Regions:
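Catalytic-core segments of nucleotide cyclases and related cyclic-nucleotide turnover enzymes
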Residues: 73-77, 84, 88-91, 105-134, ...
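Short hydrophobic/aromatic beta-strand micro-patches
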Residues: 63-65, 103
Length: 140
């Protein structure tokens, strides 16, 4: 919420894990289908809480309508569960998953560029945790 002194915002940066391997192993048409599935999952997971946008390639940004840290963590956890559910029900030879990073800021104290860099860094930290436990070369 913004007023003359403060402008609090929150956002989530999302990047698909292993998307290049989907394109390389199964073709760009399958990669495009995977992006559509992910976009639908993200809309279902986040539309109640903000606006989902495709940022670049396999990256998405959600600008949230809440700055409640616990709620943001809860909806990220729920979104990751939605990916697991999607993988269980589809018959794809690969797993869909995403790394997610978020931040809450007062734009009176931080530029939007710095904010975007911060959520990108948080997403990168999540991606490092993902790849510590998942070998990039494995598929379903």
């Amino acid at each position: 919420a913004c007023n003359k002194k403060d402008c609090w915002v929150s956002g989530i940066m999302i990047d698909l894990n292993g998307f290049k391997q989907i394109n390389d192993n199964y073709g760009h048409a399958e990669g495009d289908l995977a992006l559509c599935i992910v976009a639908d999952l993200l809309r279902k997971s986040f539309s109640e809480y903000g606006v989902v946008t495709r940022y670049a390639g396999d990256e998405f940004v959600i600008m949230l309508n809440t700055t409640d840290d616990q709620l943001i963590q809860k909806i990220i956890k729920s979104a990751k569960k939605n990916f697991v559910t999607e993988n269980e029900k589809n018959d794809k030879p690969y797993q869909l998953s995403a790394s997610m990073g978020y931040a809450i800021t007062n734009l009176s104290n931080e530029t939007i560029d710095d904010f975007m860099n911060r959520i990108d860094e948080q997403m990168y930290q999540d991606k490092m945790k993902y790849y510590e436990h998942n070998d990039r070369r494995k598929s379903k």
